[in-house]
């Protein structure tokens, strides 16, 4: 009788552990699928802000409650792959680049994250970004660019204007390599 109670108690303990593990797996799957996910940067288009092979923590739910904002670093679902870019203009904005200065709605935008790249371009005797615009961003779309303007496929040259529904989430933090952990917003 005591032996049978012991076996029943062991079985109940195993069942309890299996339920806990199952719940944890379902929780992780749902969290990753709908709320938060890792993303690996591929290429140098966001350098020096983000580097090739860095891993990011992406907030996938933020845009369920709000719209992308200028300056957000976002993950975009393309036809064949995902891209990481910075939001430069929102629907209705007029975007223009003149002599390496960005203008949104005829106001010059300070892009402090480009200082390193602008200095490098200046030393080469070139502009970091070719002149373009003015261009009005249509409803339901955003204009994005990579921080490495000389080496980025973005709204200027290949990706085109991005539908807001193609934005999968906002980068929040670099999580790997550990020595480079930092907020990205």
Walk through the language-model features, giving the residues of each.
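Aromatic-capped interface at the extracytoplasmic side
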Residues: 30-46
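Soluble "head" domains of membrane/secretory-pathway proteins
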Residues: 2-14, 26, 30, 48, ...
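Hydrophobic membrane-insertion alpha-helices, especially the h-region
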Residues: 19-34
């Amino acid at each position: 009788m005591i032996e049978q109670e012991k076996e029943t108690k062991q079985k109940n303990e195993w069942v309890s552990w299996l339920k806990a593990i199952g719940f944890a797996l379902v929780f992780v799957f749902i969290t990753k699928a709908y709320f938060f996910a890792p993303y690996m940067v591929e290429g140098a288009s966001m350098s020096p802000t983000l580097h090739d092979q860095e891993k990011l923590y992406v907030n996938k739910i933020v845009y369920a409650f709000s719209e992308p904002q200028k300056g957000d670093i976002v993950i975009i679902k393309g036809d064949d792959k995902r891209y990481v870019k910075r939001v430069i203009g929102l629907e209705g904005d007029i975007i223009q680049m003149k002599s390496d200065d960005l203008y949104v709605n005829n106001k010059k935008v300070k892009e402090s994250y480009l200082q390193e790249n602008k200095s490098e371009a200046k030393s080469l005797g070139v502009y970091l970004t070719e002149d373009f615009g003015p261009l009005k961003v249509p409803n339901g779309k955003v204009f994005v660019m990579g921080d490495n303007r000389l080496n980025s496929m973005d709204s200027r040259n290949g990706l085109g204007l991005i539908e807001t529904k193609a934005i999968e989430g906002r980068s929040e933090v670099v999580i790997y390599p550990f020595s480079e952990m930092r907020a990205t917003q």
